[in-house]
Amino acid sequence: MTSKDEAKSSSVEERRRHALDLLPPPANSNKPLTPFSIEDILNKPSVRRSYTICGTAHLLSTAEKPPAAGLPLSSRALLSQTSPLCALEELASKTFKGLEVSVLQAAEGRDGMTIFGQRQTPKKRRKSRTAFTNHQIYELEKRFLYQKYLSPADRDQIAQQLGLTNAQVITWFQNRRAKLKRDLEEMKADVESVKKMSPSTVEAVLTISELEEETNSVRDDSRSRSPQLGLSGHMPLSPSSPLTEQHTSKECSEDEEDVEIDVDD
């Protein structure tokens, strides 16, 4: 009796196992299993393990073959790792690798790409200023004295006359008007500062300017008189002075002594 009961029970267990093996996988088989080890609780999983699991899961997913119902539990657990989380980890790893490569290239100066792949806009180069000749500046200044703003006809005439372009003439007159405006503002500020000064300081400034003018005039007079002096540094003598008469008489006597007289035999 006991042997028959054991045989019946073993056959029942085999039928149950066979029925369980024939059952389809559960609906939430794609959901990854939540580990409860100490390392997983402390959030310190090994990187190699996650990458290997995701890599094998990716290979199994690319095969595009549904798992058979009679697979063992180990293969089912491996297939259960093919989850969106693994795909997200793989995508993130590729993204960070690309960012590292772009950062290294930017540091080495290989490419003008920024970290996020946007090309840097080159800086605009400033245009070189036109070098006007002295004749051109003289003619432009002379025209600016009585005409601050030019009509199109006048602008064309000046440009053709001086060998310039219309843009160069326009730019010169704009800069000249701006310079005149700055000069007027500086003069106005100087007048306002003089008005705020006390009378004593104004008198002191005037006396200093007068002294400077006097010293400059004295220097000019001394320079104008210096060529009239002789090489020896003495004043030139007038022809009617006694010193000149003595000097001429000495020269005449010396000439008379040097002259030889021829006597006939």
From Swiss-Prot:
Pfam families: Homeodomain
InterPro entries: HD, Homeobox_CS, Homeodomain-like_sf, HTH_motif, LBX_TF
Compartment(s) where it occurs, according to its Swiss-Prot or TrEMBL record: Nucleus
Primary location group: nucleus
PROSITE patterns in UniProt: HOMEOBOX_1, HOMEOBOX_2
Gene Ontology CC: nucleus; transcription regulator complex
Classification via CDD domains: homeodomain
Bias-annotated ranges (Acidic residues): 253-265
Region feature (Disordered): 1-33, 212-265
Binding region for DNA: 125-184
Keywords associated with the record: Developmental protein, Differentiation, DNA-binding, Homeobox, Myogenesis, Nucleus, Transcription, Transcription regulation
Comp. bias regions, Basic and acidic residues: 1-20
SMART domains linked: HOX
Record-level GO BP terms: cell differentiation; muscle organ development; myoblast proliferation; negative regulation of transcription by RNA polymerase II; regulation of DNA-templated transcription
Any one GO MF annotation of this record: DNA binding
Function summary: Transcription factor that controls hypaxial muscle development by down-regulating myod1 and cdkn1b/p27, thereby allowing myoblasts to proliferate before the onset of terminal differentiation.
Name of the protein described by the UniProt record: Transcription factor LBX1
Source organism (scientific name): Xenopus tropicalis
